[in-house]
Amino acid sequence: MELVFIRHGFSEWNAKNLFTGWRDVNLTERGIEEAKAAGKKLLDAGYEFDIAFTSVLTRAIKTCNIVLEESNQLWIPQVKNWRLNERHYGALQGLDKKATAEQYGDEQVHIWRRSYDISPPDLDPQDPNSAHNDRRYAHLPKDVVPNAENLKITLERVLPFWEDQIAPALLSGKRVLVTAHGNSLRALAKHIIGISDEEIMDFEIPTGQPLVLKLDDKLNFVEKFYL
């Protein structure tokens, strides 16, 4: 069986080189074109899906919609869930990456961005931009909504959704598309492929390119490739 991942298209804050995380920003024209191209690749390669999973952030939802529209599959069920959100970058969200490196040093920022188990500073829950003040998370217990995450914590957040939703869909024979974010997809890939804590630091997923994971009938990893 095959599972297809797509990282959302290039966003407004990708273009501005800002830390994004759980902040809700839109796609750029480049991002829209990336999503259209991804949908056409899937159409040309004959990929059909029974269900699509995405996050509750606009850039991923729009990417999912565009991909499905371009591949003539906009009608299939979509499941939006906060567990597929991008990694929460804490107090770094909204900051310029270059300016942050100048303030804290390249090494410290690299650790915050790439280490598996070290988180950036927390975002104050009272901050107007905190997810605690966003109604799309109002149904969640306060202690579940993050103030900052590393990749390890992101994996712990994503894994229940894999086990409860994505894996059962695959095992039931459904053809699955997951349109999400760089780090939530990296976390899922780490679990599925078996990437080590060290190797995951250098594992990247580019925006808007369909990544196909081939799995056996027990969801063991076989191979991966980009369309």
Swiss-Prot record:
Keyword line: Gluconeogenesis, Glycolysis, Isomerase
Active-site residues, record numbering mapped to chain: 8 (tele-phosphohistidine intermediate), 86 (proton donor/acceptor)
InterPro entries for the chain: His_Pase_superF_clade-1, His_PPase_superfam, Phosphogly_mut1
GO biological process entries: gluconeogenesis; glycolytic process
Role summary: Catalyzes the interconversion of 2-phosphoglycerate and 3-phosphoglycerate.
Subunit structure: Homodimer.
Name assigned to this protein: 2,3-bisphosphoglycerate-dependent phosphoglycerate mutase
